[in-house]
Amino acid sequence: MATYSTNEFKSGLKVMLDGDPCSIVENEFVKPGKGQAFNRVKMKNLKSGRVWERTFKSGESLEGADVVDRDMQYLYNDGEFWHFMEPESFEQFQGDASVVGDSAKWLNEQDTVVVTLYNGSPLAVTPPNHVELEIVETDPGLKGDTAQGGTKPATLSTGAVVKVPLFLSTGETVRVDTRTGEYLGRANK
């Protein structure tokens, strides 16, 4: 596996630290007036999700993590596991609630998601940035009911709840940003 020196550190780089795969969230090069230069690095443990800060002297190196991001198709949830399939090889992977996490509320069957694999097993699931989901439950919007800024809560087909404009009703399909959970607009169908 490749090794990365401190001058190669950048956001998103995946390295091994204390036996666990980690991702660099932030990297700051510091050159004090006196003493040796160093990197102040904010890292996220890909297994536990814990984020912490650590400093490395200039010239130190870390081993690259055997972590691969692959596009996969979400198949189904059997109550305990979420199942994903590699489109080229048709190889299937399954992840539990700790792997899927908050992404579960944005997963729609047949959607393409990014699955992070470590030693052949899923570590994390990243949904697409924008998804189209159907509204299954929302209050009817009454004319003149804009005391709250013109939005109302709506439950989507995956169970996620988002704020939508008053003119939308049950059965309509909307586009949602999965990173922020915000309504983007009606889906073009």
Curated annotation (Swiss-Prot):
Pathway: Protein biosynthesis; polypeptide chain elongation. Belongs to the elongation factor P family. This is Elongation factor P. It is found in: Cytoplasm. CDD domains: S1_EF-P_repeat_1 (cd04470), S1_EF-P_repeat_2 (cd05794). May be beta-lysylated on the epsilon-amino group of Lys-34 by the combined action of EpmA and EpmB, and then hydroxylated on the C5 position of the same residue by EpmC (if this protein is present). Lysylation is critical for the stimulatory effect of EF-P on peptide-bond formation. The lysylation moiety may extend toward the peptidyltransferase center and stabilize the terminal 3-CCA end of the tRNA. Hydroxylation of the C5 position on Lys-34 may allow additional potential stabilizing hydrogen-bond interactions with the P-tRNA. Keywords: Cytoplasm, Elongation factor, Hydroxylation, Protein biosynthesis. It comes from Teredinibacter turnerae (strain ATCC 39867 / T7901). PANTHER family: ELONGATION FACTOR P (PTHR30053), ELONGATION FACTOR P (EF-P) FAMILY PROTEIN (PTHR30053:SF12). Its main location: cytoplasm. GO terms for molecular function: translation elongation factor activity. Pfam families: EFP, EFP_N, Elong-fact-P_C. Involved in peptide bond synthesis. Alleviates ribosome stalling that occurs when 3 or more consecutive Pro residues or the sequence PPG is present in a protein, possibly by augmenting the peptidyl transferase activity of the ribosome. Modification of Lys-34 is required for alleviation. One of its GO terms (cellular component) is cytoplasm. The modification N6-(3,6-diaminohexanoyl)-5-hydroxylysine is found at K34. GO terms for biological process: peptide biosynthetic process.
